[in-house]
């Protein structure tokens, strides 16, 4: 039986199946993601990371959500950086990873954490994208079955909508309103939904609904989006700790500069998956 070698990794509880590009070259990657990411029925993960050699740099990555859609992922980027070093794609601690959102600088820190530059956030409606006017799109009212919710929408490589609340939503509200906003017609490519509590100017707490994945324990581009949005609203400074159920991520942003994301990237286990279970 032909098997697929894989690594299981996570960044603050945001977990991924990681595979080498050459081992899946003949497979349909969206279908592979749908199969491998199914919890309880397969390996289970928030996404599939496919890692190979880049055209202009040593490492290239692609990320697929559990529903098969391709996306940008900050925690996935940091896991790819760690995986690339462990598997010998690069020798140094600083290098560049090619992504669908451009080239991203990464650095493995002495304490084992990984730092990544995600680029500058985008606020223009056409780049988020969101069908609204003004830049940035702040306090956009969305009428839900339970009432009006105001969101601030932006892109940090992926589309996010931030909701500031005094306390994180309970399951009923979270599971009702999050998918409603994700699939709202205002968002042509859907949106992740970030329920955010500002605990101090340097500390945020989130509950996360990711487009294409549902609830996740952490989200790297989402942590960046929440930190940037809090700064836009005058609620936070340039350096912010973002807590979510999976742990803490550290975000730094100064207007006009790239957003940087720092946190752990951990190898959980490695294994082999029977390829006969996945059709080309």
Where do the PLM segments sit?
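Ligand-binding beta-strand-loop-alpha-helix segment within the catalytic cores
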Residues: 114, 122-124
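Extended Gly/Ser/Thr-rich low-complexity repeat segments
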Residues: 125-136, 270-275
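Internal active-site segments that recognize and position negatively charged phosphoryl groups
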Residues: 138-170
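A glycine-rich beta-to-alpha transition motif near the start of alpha/beta enzyme domains, typified by
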Residues: 1-111, 162-280
